UniProtKB/Swiss-Prot annotation:
Propeptide segments, given as residue ranges: 133-138
SMART domains reported in the protein's UniProt record: GHB
Subcellular location: Secreted
Cystine pairings recorded for this chain: C22-C72, C36-C87, C39-C125, C47-C103, C51-C105, C108-C115
PROSITE patterns xref list: GLYCO_HORMONE_BETA_1, GLYCO_HORMONE_BETA_2
Glycan attachment points: N43
Any Gene Ontology biological process: G protein-coupled receptor signaling pathway
One Gene Ontology cellular component annotation held by this UniProt entry: extracellular space
Oligomer status and interactors: Heterodimer of a common alpha chain and a unique beta chain which confers biological specificity to thyrotropin, lutropin, follitropin and gonadotropin.
Protein name, entry field: Thyrotropin subunit beta
CDD domains cross-referenced by the UniProt entry: GHB_like
Function: Indispensable for the control of thyroid structure and metabolism.
Lineage: Eukaryota, Metazoa, Chordata, Craniata, Vertebrata
UniProt keyword annotations, A-Z: Disulfide bond, Glycoprotein, Hormone, Secreted, Signal
Length: 138
């Protein structure tokens, strides 16, 4: 009986990890500043995918922090910095953005993640695009 219980626990843990499809995914974002002449298209990675979660029936009896569900979020990330071309001298031309190195299923941390249900559909350029990108690692 102990062997069956142990095997079911191992199988459950293995399936839980494989069913959680949360990985760094390629993402293209457009960056522009009001004062600068050009828009940059940046290829980066973000955390995207599905996480195993379950809904608790006894919601009335639990504290609010116990009701949050896991989301696909950053485990490790680094920042890269690009220079937006065509900026006047009084404007800082640098823009820093996160690059996902690895991801995990966990609580959404508003210190470094945008924890909204639906994204704002503003990922496009309104200015001419510049073809070169100079990156700096920070």
């Amino acid at each position: 009986m102990t062997a069956i219980f142990l095997m079911s626990m191992v199988f459950g843990l293995a399936c839980g990890q494989t069913m959680s499809f949360c990985i760094p995914t390629e993402y293209m974002m457009h960056v522009e500043r009001k004062e600068c002449a050009y828009c940059l298209t940046i290829n980066t990675t973000i955390c995207a995918g599905y996480c195993m979660t379950r809904d608790i029936n006894g919601k009335l009896f639990l504290p609010k922090y116990a009701l949050s569900q896991d989301v696909c979020t950053y485990r490790d990330f680094m920042y890269k910095t690009v220079e937006i071309p065509g900026c006047p001298d009084h404007v800082t031309p640098y823009f820093s953005y996160p690059v996902a190195v690895s991801c995990k299923c966990g609580k959404c941390n508003t210190d470094y993640s945008d924890c909204i249900h639906e994204a704002i559909k503003a990922n496009y350029c309104t200015k001419p695009q510049k073809s070169y990108v100079v990156e700096f690692s920070i």
